[in-house]
């Protein structure tokens, strides 16, 4: 099917053609016609499936028709809620891309950016706003935004918004909008919590489910390396990044502190490397991502929160320096590579301290991650991957598609620094309900927008 068959207007089709796209993705093919028909919908789809365009294009088409509102409100006709600033920026860029040949007044309301700029945006007529819940609530409490003419509410990555503690904020924002609005909800998982949210906010929604697990995993070669300790991880990393085939890579660290230290170490060794985490100002994060896209950065050391929604083409490798505590985050991490028909390589380090996380991941994806050994860097001890000594049973797929996220193992354990024996505080961890995410929530509320300088690196331990 071509985009022209989706009944999109000519200005949008012209923008799509300019981007070089010819065929809609499955989520676009299913969601766009229903959205254009004005139906509420729930779409279960993973990142990298084209879901952003699936709601941006119908939103723009709605804005091509004059508003029927008779009031004098300057508020938006379309509101897109998303959990992180990175996702908000990505959606804002999509609006500009597909609305290139339309006269659309749009803007972003998110933490880490000056209040006065957002106040100026809200004081003028605006058609479409992309926002993070925390900062939007701040403006609502100040009486600076009116939703009386809102026609469309989009919840992007709704499951992640709830995970980050935005459930009450989402309900409050939705309650401030007209009950006659159209609502579209996009989520990676569909559990009971999400079902209850949909029941509260949506009206007789159409359900769309796009399979994503097998497609994602089949495009990515997964590898596992057993690590004796942090020094062993460093030596293996040094070997792996010397591969000329590693054009562009994201290295995931479990803490903000270690992301800074690791990036500094890599930079000192002559690599074009930088860190990306929640303590950085929005401008610093945008600058880092732009440098990555332009090829100025080869190795990006990131935490889960900062990399959520990161859309950079040409990522050949993902390296899990630290395994995520949550199995779902593993899939989101490795999904940064192997996109848009390309293949990718995902390499994970696992020490004896991370066995529980590894077991959870392998149960979630329904397979064992093939183990490899680097000659000369063999582990001193084998990794006991399963309590029974057998491979994990194949997954039925239900956990991926609908059940709640996997249990967090070792939640109260303080991870060790990769550059010494000193333990880091749990407040530095980047787990699913970590304080890093909670701080990101507060930053979106505008209370903690400062930028902390990267800590100096510890003496090198790579030899």
Question: Which residues does each predicted region cover?
Answer:
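Conserved helicase RecA-like core
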Residues: 2-383
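Arginine-glycine-biased low-complexity disordered regions
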Residues: 246, 268, 294, 312-314, ...
């Amino acid at each position: 099917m071509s985009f022209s068959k989706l009944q999109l207007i000519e200005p949008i089709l012209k923008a799509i053609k300019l981007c070089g796209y010819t065929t809609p993705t499955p989520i676009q093919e299913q969601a766009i016609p229903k959205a254009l028909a004005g139906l509420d919908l729930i779409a279960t789809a993973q990142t990298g499936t084209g879901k952003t365009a699936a709601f941006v294009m119908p939103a723009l088409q709605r804005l091509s028709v004059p508003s029927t509102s008779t009031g004098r409100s300057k508020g938006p006709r379309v509101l897109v809620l998303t959990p992180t600033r990175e996702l908000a920026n990505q959606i804002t860029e999509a609006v500009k891309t597909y609305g290139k040949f339309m006269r659309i007044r749009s803007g972003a309301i998110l933490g880490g950016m000056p209040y006065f700029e957002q106040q100026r945006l809200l004081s003028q007529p605006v058609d479409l706003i992309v926002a993070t819940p925390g900062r939007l609530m701040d403006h609502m409490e100040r009486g600076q935004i009116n939703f009386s003419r809102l026609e469309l509410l989009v919840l992007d990555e709704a499951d992640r918004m709830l995970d980050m503690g935005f459930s009450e904020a989402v309900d409050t924002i939705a309650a401030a909008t007209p009950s006659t609005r159209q609502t579209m909800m996009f989520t990676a998982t569909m559990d009971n919590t999400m079902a209850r949210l949909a029941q509260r906010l949506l009206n007789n929604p159409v359900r769309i489910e796009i399979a994503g697990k097998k497609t994602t995993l089949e495009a990515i070669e997964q590898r596992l390396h057993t690590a004796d300790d942090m020094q062993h991880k460093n030596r293996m990393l040094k070997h792996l990044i010397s591969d000329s085939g590693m054009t562009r890579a994201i290295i995931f660290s479990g803490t903000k502190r270690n992301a800074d230290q690791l990036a500094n170490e890599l930079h000192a060794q002559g690599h074009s490397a930088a860190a990306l985490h929640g303590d950085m100002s929005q401008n610093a994060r945008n600058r880092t991502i732009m440098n990555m896209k332009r090829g100025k950065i080869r190795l990006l050391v990131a935490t889960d929160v900062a990399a959520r929604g990161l859309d950079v083409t040409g990522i050949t490798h993902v390296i899990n320096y630290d395994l995520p505590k949550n199995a779902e985050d593993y899939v989101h991490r490795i999904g940064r590579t192997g996109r848009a028909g390309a293949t990718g390589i995902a390499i994970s380090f696992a020490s004896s301290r991370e066995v529980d996380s590894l077991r959870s991941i392998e149960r979630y994806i329904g397979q064992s991650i093939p183990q490899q050994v680097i000659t000369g860097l063999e582990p001193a001890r084998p990794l006991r991957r399963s309590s029974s000594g057998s491979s994990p049973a194949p997954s039925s797929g239900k956990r991926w598609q609908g059940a709640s996220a996997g249990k967090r193992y070792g939640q109260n354990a303080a991870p060790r620094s990769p550059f010494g024996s000193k333990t880091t505080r749990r407040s530095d961890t980047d787990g699913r309900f970590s304080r890093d995410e909670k701080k990101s929530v507060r930053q979106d509320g505008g209370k903690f927008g400062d930028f902390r300088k990267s800590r100096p690196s510890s003496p090198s331990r790579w030899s």
